Amino acid sequence: MGNKWSKSWPQVRERMRRAPAPAADGVGAVSQDLAKHGAITSSNTAATNADCAWLEAQTEEEVGFPVKPQIPLRPMTYKGAVDLSFFLKEKGGLDGLIYSKKRQEILDLWVHNTQGYFPDWQNYTPGPGIRYPLTFGWCYKLVPVDPSEVEEANEGENNCLLHPICQHGIEDEEREVLQWKFDSSLARRHIARELHPEFYKDC
């Protein structure tokens, strides 16, 4: 019996390896289309989807990165989110960085152009307080920074008014200054789904 199984196992293993990974829980509608259909469907256009409109604007304005996407468009997967999280942790730069919408857009555009992931995966739970990633596997949460720390960081400086830390949460609905914090437990536990199961009804 074992002999019969061992003969067919290499073909099965190869088929499993070639099967596309499913989209991670919590990704947007376009990534769900990419996972199900292998392409963006007509239900997600620049007119109906904010992420498509944003990406189209980046392409038309040629703002950001000079390279075009280097690999085919694909949805963010659990493994992709975990790998990207640990890559950014190892290389440094994101952990502890003050969050702003512009910085998120720069990261999304870089990931889109270098890895091919459609930029609808970096979404967070609503505030106030810690914002957990909706995409399972993304190990960066947004943590509020104490206003006194903001003042200490800016002490003696008068030329950084546009720096995100100086905006005192002006972009945030809760008026909180947020920073990205790496949390490896987010690779094992989907806290956003536990706190907000209503966000995952259509997944």
Swiss-Prot record:
- Give the residue ranges of motif PxxP: 69-72
Q: Is the Membrane keyword given for this protein?
A: yes
Lipidation, N-myristoyl glycine type:
G2
- Annotated region described as Binding to ATP6V1H, given as residue ranges: 145-177
| Region named Disordered | 1-25
Per the UniProt record, the site (Cleavage) maps to W54, L55
Q: Where can the motif Diacidic be found?
A: 171-172
Q: Where is this region: Acidic?
A: 59-62
| Phosphoserine, modified sites | S6
Q: Name one GO molecular function term.
A: GTP binding
Pfam families from the UniProt entry: F-protein (PF00469)
List GO BP terms, alphabetically.
symbiont-mediated suppression of host antigen processing and presentation of peptide antigen via MHC class I; symbiont-mediated suppression of host antigen processing and presentation of peptide antigen via MHC class II; symbiont-mediated suppression of host autophagy
Query: What factors induce this protein?
Result: Expressed early in the viral replication cycle.
Chain spans, region SH3-binding: 66-75
State the domain notes: The N-terminal domain is composed of the N-myristoyl glycine and of a cluster of positively charged amino acids. It is required for inner plasma membrane targeting of Nef and virion incorporation, and thereby for infectivity. This domain is also involved in binding to TP53.
Q: What else is known?
A: HIV-1 lineages are divided in three main groups, M (for Major), O (for Outlier), and N (for New, or Non-M, Non-O). The vast majority of strains found worldwide belong to the group M. Group O seems to be endemic to and largely confined to Cameroon and neighboring countries in West Central Africa, where these viruses represent a small minority of HIV-1 strains. The group N is represented by a limited number of isolates from Cameroonian persons. The group M is further subdivided in 9 clades or subtypes (A to D, F to H, J and K).
Q: Describe the task this protein carries out.
A: Factor of infectivity and pathogenicity, required for optimal virus replication. Alters numerous pathways of T-lymphocyte function and down-regulates immunity surface molecules in order to evade host defense and increase viral infectivity. Alters the functionality of other immunity cells, like dendritic cells, monocytes/macrophages and NK cells.
Protein name per the record: Protein Nef
**Taxonomic lineage of this organism?**
Viruses, Riboviria, Pararnavirae, Artverviricota, Revtraviricetes
